[in-house]
């Protein structure tokens, strides 16, 4: 079984008619998951209600000033944090619900020993302490990592980020903590321009794997076998979080890599050596057919 944490509320973060990070991303994925082989082994659940006690966990990663700014911008009818990152009237509440969904994913894995896919938006891995950027408002995975360390039995958390763009926000929000380990495979050079191989974190707890444009499944397979898996084996995490972006697909309009959907199943298969019960959550991926198929392929090794 795999738990899918999803709510139609995530569709209420409005980005405009031409923005690639659109509500249709989630509906395309949800439709594909409900039709996939083994769909009866997917357990759909809604995130818990958002209450005041979520704030202390968000504030581990974001400043109160930024949260106030984001809430006010939404309250005043919306606007944008930068040229790429719109905020609609519902965006603040939806972003908080996305955080809640990720924390529910952590709880589910620890309590039920069952893998989770958090089907939520807006994405988060570019958001830094004092602002959102790159389509991201709150850094869901970084908040989830810090939250996980408050749970009994969790001493070390690993984050794997396979989005085609480096998770600059995630790295910045976790690299000071020697109990959180961050590994990113990403096209380089590419937005946001961070993630050089020499950036290792304050405690040697970061592994950046910059890949040249045009990399295919063979390139990713070699990266997993020679870099990702040795790093994670050494970490021996009590919990594995995955920033699952799908914009390294060959058909994605925002980058220049050459993965096919089946390559994501290969990556999941490798990860199961480290943890059979990961928390995966959606980041990027903007070509709807390949996005939906890639999520299906991601989950197949966890079901069969």
Curated annotation (Swiss-Prot):
| Molecular function via GO | histone deacetylase activity; hydrolase activity
| Organism (species) | Synechocystis sp. (strain ATCC 27184 / PCC 6803 / Kazusa)
* Record protein name field: Uncharacterized protein slr0245
**InterPro entries, per this entry?**
HDAC_PDAC (IPR050284), His_deacetylse (IPR000286), His_deacetylse_dom (IPR023801), His_deacetylse_dom_sf (IPR037138), Ureohydrolase_dom_sf (IPR023696)
Keywords attached to this entry: Hydrolase
What SUPFAM superfamilies does the record tag this protein with? Arginase/deacetylase (SSF52768)
Annotated GO biological process? epigenetic regulation of gene expression
Q: Does the keyword Membrane apply?
A: no
Disulfide bond positions: none
Q: What family is this?
A: Belongs to the histone deacetylase family.
Its job: Putative deacetylase.
């Amino acid at each position: 079984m795999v738990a899918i944490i999803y709510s139609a509320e995530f569709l209420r973060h409005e980005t405009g008619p031409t923005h690639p990070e659109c509500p249709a991303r989630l509906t395309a994925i949800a439709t594909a998951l409900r039709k996939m082989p083994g769909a009866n082994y997917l357990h759909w659940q809604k995130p818990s209600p958002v209450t005041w006690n979520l704030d202390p966990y968000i504030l581990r990663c974001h400043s109160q000033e930024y949260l106030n700014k984001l809430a006010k911008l939404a309250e005043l009818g919306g606007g944008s944090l930068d040229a790429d990152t719109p905020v609609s009237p519902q965006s603040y509440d939806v972003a908080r619900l996305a955080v809640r969904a990720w924390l529910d994913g952590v709880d589910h894995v620890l309590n039920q020993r069952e893998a989770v896919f958090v089907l939520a938006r807006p994405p988060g891995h570019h958001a830094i302490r004092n602002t959102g950027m790159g389509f991201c408002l709150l850094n869901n995975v970084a908040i989830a990592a810090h939250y996980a360390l408050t749970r009994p039995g969790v001493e070390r958390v690993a984050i794997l980020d396979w989005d085609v763009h480096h998770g600059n926000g995630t790295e910045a929000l976790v690299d000071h903590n020697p109990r959180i380990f961050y590994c990113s495979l990403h096209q380089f050079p590419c937005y946001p321009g961070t993630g050089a191989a020499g950036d290792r974190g304050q405690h040697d707890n970061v592994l950046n794997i910059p890949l040249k444009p045009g990399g295919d499944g063979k390139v990713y397979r070699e990266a997993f076998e020679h870099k990702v898996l040795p790093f994670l084996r050494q970490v021996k995490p009590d919990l594995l979080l995955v920033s699952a972006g799908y914009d390294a697909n060959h058909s994605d309009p925002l980058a220049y890599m050459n993965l096919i959907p089946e390559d994501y199943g290969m990556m999941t298969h490798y990860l199961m050596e480290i943890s059979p019960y990961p928390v995966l959550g959606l980041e990027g991926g903007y070509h709807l057919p390949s996005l939906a198929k890639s999520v299906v392929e991601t989950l197949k090794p966890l079901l069969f």
